[in-house]
């Protein structure tokens, strides 16, 4: 029915809408394909497990010190999407220090390898000319696929790397 409706009542506007949707889906598919080849460091699996355990461990977050923002704000990193910005700010406010402590327990080289893989994946998504929300969702799907974690955990981890300037930060040339 949809195809028949489109064929019989096609307008330039409907055609352009369909073309733009196709281009957006193609970009998203290309970005996911690019990221599917990127590896996740083994140490990230431990972090994923500990974040996942927060569902039953009420005390873990209360041990963290209050968050202090002294870096580029999330609003500066995500200026054109208030919903995404608010979502990321909430996740960062709740989990950033906890995850930072988890990463402190790793040796510096392991953390740098994980951060580099996020930066590399982010750059690949940017190359596909995805908008910020599509980049966020592509990275979330990448983390989920590579670590087999829940969507909520993947969103927390990607938000951490946004605050940590590995995603949406200024890219050096």
Where are these regions (language model features)?
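C-terminal, charged low-complexity interaction regions
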Residues: 64-173
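Hydrophobic transmembrane alpha-helix bundles
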Residues: 9-12, 49-59, 145-151, 168-173
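Short flanking/linker segments adjacent to small metal-binding domains or redox-active Cys/His motifs
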Residues: 36-79
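Short HxH-centered metal-ligating active-site micro-motif
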Residues: 1
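Polybasic, low-complexity binding patches
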Residues: 4-46
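Residue-level signal for secondary-structure boundary elements
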Residues: 30-33, 52, 56-59, 107, ...
């Amino acid at each position: 029915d949809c195809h028949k409706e489109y064929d019989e009542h096609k307008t330039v506007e409907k055609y352009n809408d369909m073309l733009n949707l196709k281009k957006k889906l193609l970009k998203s598919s290309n970005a996911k394909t690019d990221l599917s080849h990127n590896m996740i460091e083994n140490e990230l699996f431990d972090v994923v497990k500990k974040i996942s355990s927060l569902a039953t461990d009420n005390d873990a977050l209360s041990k963290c010190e209050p968050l202090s923002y002294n870096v580029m704000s999330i609003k500066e990193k995500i200026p054109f999407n208030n919903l995404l910005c608010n979502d990321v700010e909430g996740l960062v406010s709740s989990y950033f220090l906890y995850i930072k402590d988890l990463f402190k327990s790793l040796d510096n080289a392991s953390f740098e390898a994980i951060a580099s893989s996020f930066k590399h994946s982010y750059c690949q998504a940017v190359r596909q000319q995805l908008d910020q929300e599509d980049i966020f969702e592509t990275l979330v799907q990448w983390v989920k696929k590579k670590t087999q974690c829940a969507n909520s955990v993947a969103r927390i981890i990607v938000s951490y790397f946004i605050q940590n300037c590995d995603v949406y930060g200024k890219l050096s040339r």
